[in-house]
Every structure is written in C-alpha cells, then in structure tokens.
C-alpha cells in the first residue's frame, strides 16, 4: 500500500490564499481533542486542549469498524468539561498571526525511545515519540483558526480549521462552529473527516452554563463508514443536560452496526448491534489529563500566545481586571496599527507557519 503524506498546503474554504496555512515536508501524525474553557488563555492556545486526551490507539485497531468506533470514542470524549479556575477572567481575542505550539509526552512511549529531535513540523524540538501541536490565527475578519498535530512514530495526524459566528438568543448566546477536521491514518490510507457542534451559553444574566447542540458527522470515504452524532440541547422543562447519541453505519447499510448514548461530560455507553455486546465507550472520571509542554515565554517568538498575552495574564493572576483591560487594549491597538500600515502599503497578509 502506498503511504500517503499530508497535503503540503492547508486551505480553509472562503479564505484568501494570503491566509493559507502551509506545511512542508510533513509525513507524520496526530489524534485526540477536548473542548475546555480555559482562563487565562487565548482561543488559539485553548483549542490545543482538544488534543489533551490522546487516543493513539486508533492506529492499532485491526478493522475499519474498530477504527471508526475508536475515532468516535476519541471525538466524543474530547468535549468534556474543563479546568476550573478561581482567578479573574478576561476574554483574549486571538490576534492575526498568533501561534501556539506545544507537545505531550505519551504514556505508551518507550522509556528509552527515540529522543532525537524531529527538526521540522509543528514543534521541531520534540521527539518522534511525542505528540506535537501548532495553532495559528489565520484570519481576523472572519475569525478563522487553523490547527495541526502529528505523532511521527504512530503515523497519525490531525488538521482542522474553525470559524465561529456568535448570535444573541434572548438570555442565551449561540456560537455557530463552522469548519471541519481530518484525522489521517497514513499506514492504512484512511481519512476521517469530522464537523463540530454548536455551543450555547445559557442563563447569561443569572448563573451561566454551557451546552453543545446540533448534528455532526464523522465520515471515512476510503472505508465507507460514517457516524451520525446528535448533541441534544436541554428542553426548557425537564430533561437532562449534555445528552449525546451516535449511530455508526457501514457503506449503504440502513442499520447501524454500533450505537452510543449518554452524557458527553460524564459517561457514554456503546453497543454492538450484531452481537448485542454493551460497553462503556468512555467515562470522564477515568480520564487522566496529560500536561502539555511549552517553551518558556522568554524563548518564544513575539507572536506566540503566551508571550503576546503575558501582561494580561499577569494582571489576571493578580486579580487586577483594570490592568488586564489596559494590557489587552494595548495588544489590540498594536494589531490595528499594523493593519493600517498593511492597507496603506498594499501589503497582503501571509500566514506564519510555512
């Protein structure tokens, strides 16, 4: 079987070519994901949490059915509720060209594994046994973020782009997540294309809470397998929060060979239709978060998230909201000034990751 390399150019539909995220000499990998509310953090940085609960076991599954179920397990488990924080919070609006890089040590990596730096890719200083990740804000109007991750030795990769549109809905705020992601298994030549649910901030004037809602799909063109997932919003009267259901089909089959249901922030149970065997697809309480590895701020480039927002972060940790506001405005004013200079000179914006 011919081994497939990832595309050298990543392009989100609707983006000008000047806002294209490009990757060169990549022939590697990536996997897991998890939505989390993070503070203090820029959204460009926080999307990396989708990769925090890694399921590299996708590549170890023997059949297309097993691999699709494993992709669904990873996808659904990645949305569970995130870190609690007692510090003051201030929203960070990612600036154009902002980058975030990190990597994770994997549990299944050999203690004496290959520690040679890969020398290229999202995080050139990590090893082939580690999962690396990079995110870039590739457009400001509209706000589009692009992401890429890979695990060299497992030969699995993940790339995605996301554009959010917000709308007030009375006492709620709705966030429409426009975009898609692709999990690529290089050795078996399979690509799993997925979409994202919408988010809702409820009871914004009293005790706010967040839920997901809408239909999403995960599809593998090569194997013909497809998962239809429904994130169910809570009814106005009664009902449970955070419900999710899933059906997985093979080819043109009318009957799902695997179904799942539960609460995405606690536990989801699955069932194999043919055998009737039931299983716990995932349980959040058994999931151990992994600590991401990031360069010290002093060694980061000027456009990397933690360096861009360092003064805002310091103010938030000191519970100084006025200081955080001033620092945030300074960052945003610099962005506006740079945009005016580009407009005056006719310069087109080029993405940073090449």
Q: Language-model features: where?
A:
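Extended acidic, Ser/Thr- and Pro-enriched interaction/regulatory segments
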Residues: 1-56, 60, 65-354
């Amino acid at each position: 079987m011919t081994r497939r390399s990832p595309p050298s150019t990543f392009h989100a539909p609707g983006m000008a070519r000047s806002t294209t995220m490009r990757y060169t000499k990549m022939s590697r990998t990536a996997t897991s994901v998890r939505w989390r509310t993070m503070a203090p953090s820029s959204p460009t940085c926080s999307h990396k949490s989708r990769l925090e609960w890694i399921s590299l076991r996708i590549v170890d599954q023997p059949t297309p059915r097993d691999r699709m179920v494993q992709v669904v397990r990873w996808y659904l488990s990645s949305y569970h509720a995130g870190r609690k924080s007692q510090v003051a919070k201030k929203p960070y609006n990612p600036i154009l060209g902002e980058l975030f890089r990190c990597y994770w040590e994997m549990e299944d990596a050999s203690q004496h594994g290959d520690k040679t730096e890969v020398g290229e890719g999202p995080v050139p200083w990590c090893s082939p046994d580690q999962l690396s990740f990079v995110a870039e804000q590739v457009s400001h109007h509209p706000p589009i973020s692009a992401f890429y991750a890979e695990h060299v030795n497992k030969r699995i990769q993940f790339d995605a782009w996301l554009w959010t549109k917000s709308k007030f809905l009375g006492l709620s705020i709705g966030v429409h997540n426009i975009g898609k992601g692709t999990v690529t298994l290089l050795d078996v030549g399979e690509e799993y294309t997925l979409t994202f649910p919408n988010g809702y901030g409820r009871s914004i004037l009293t005790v706010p809470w967040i839920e997901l809602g809408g239909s999403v799909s995960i599809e593998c063109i090569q194997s013909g397998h497809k998962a239809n997932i429904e994130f169910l919003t809570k009814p106005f009267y009664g009902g449970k929060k955070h419900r999710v259901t899933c059906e997985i089909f093979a080819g043109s089959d009318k009957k799902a060979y695997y179904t799942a249901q539960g609460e995405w922030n606690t536990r989801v149970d699955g069932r194999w239709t043919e055998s009737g065997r039931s299983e716990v697809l995932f349980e959040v309480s058994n999931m151990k978060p992994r600590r991401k590895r990031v360069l010290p701020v002093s060694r980061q480039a000027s456009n990397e998230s933690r360096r861009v927002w360092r003064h805002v972060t310091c103010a938030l940790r000191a519970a100084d909201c006025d200081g955080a506001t001033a620092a945030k405005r300074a960052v945003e004013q610099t962005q506006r000034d740079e945009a005016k200079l580009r407009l005056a000179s006719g310069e087109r914006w080029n993405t940073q990751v090449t």
